[in-house]
Amino acid sequence: MYYGLDIGGTKIELAVFNEELEKLYSERVPTPKTDYEEWLNTIVDLVNRADEKFGEVGTVGLGVPGFVNQQTGLAEITNIRVADNKPILRDLSVRLGREVRAENDANCFALSEAWDTENQQYPTVLGLILGTGFGGGFVLNGKVHSGQVGMAGELGHLQLNYHALKLLGWDNAPIYQCGCGNKACLDNYLSGRGFEMLYRDLKGETLSAREIIDLFYQGNESAVDFVNLFVELAAISIGNIITAFDPHMIVLGGGLSNFDYLYEALPKALPPHLMRTAKVPPIKKAKHGDSGGVRGAAALFLTK
């Protein structure tokens, strides 16, 4: 059996999959906040219960909101302070008596989608998450591309470029401070949170993403104008990412990926922001929803 764990700031989910990546079982527990040993033991207990339930020793893959530095072995997951800067793979492997692997949760999401039968025709798949934050993962020939250190795909920390700042009004452009220490990171613009903050600062009204989208479909002038601007901002930024990766397919996840208008508007908005010979790849909605992260984490032992 293949176990995938989604390690979040508020909950830890374990799911069990077979070789066809069909989910057979799942369990969620709260994430311990203050004690590292308790955090480790919570994961160990989840895995041991799965072993007992299925009568075998399963493989263990983790999806984390950050990455494990491949050179130092230390986790860089600042929003889970209890495990940040800790050798989580070593400590879990010792306690579980087996190898444990980890990848960024966006990489796991991309891997899950890339492994679907209908998507295996694409040699390269770019996964973009437009959720609480903005991030990405890149799958090459069925395997996650992690980079030298393990931080490949940290696309949320690319910054607004010339065209994006011009679109937002230069000196009047909202410039948001990022948790990474820099300013104007895409994480604060292309995420669901960024969608709401931009509407507030550009339109002077505080609304949820759902409320903005509802107004858009009702033909509200302010919402329509804002959504068109957001699509253009996304096209500028994703266009740069396409230029860097030239993917065969893009899959969108996270809350904003449920905004169906994006799949109509983005392919039309992208060409001016690409090189003349570039091709806009198919842009698809994620198939597995909230299960994508654990499914991709489980798949780490099918692909390495």
Curated annotation (Swiss-Prot):
This is N-acetyl-D-glucosamine kinase. InterPro entries: ATPase_NBD, N-acetyl-D-glucosamine_kinase, ROK, ROK_cs. ATP binds at residues 4-11, 133-140. It comes from Haemophilus influenzae (strain 86-028NP). It catalyses: N-acetyl-D-glucosamine + ATP = N-acetyl-D-glucosamine 6-phosphate + ADP + H(+). The gene is nagK. It comes from the Bacteria. Gene3D superfamilies: 3.30.420.40. Pfam families: ROK.
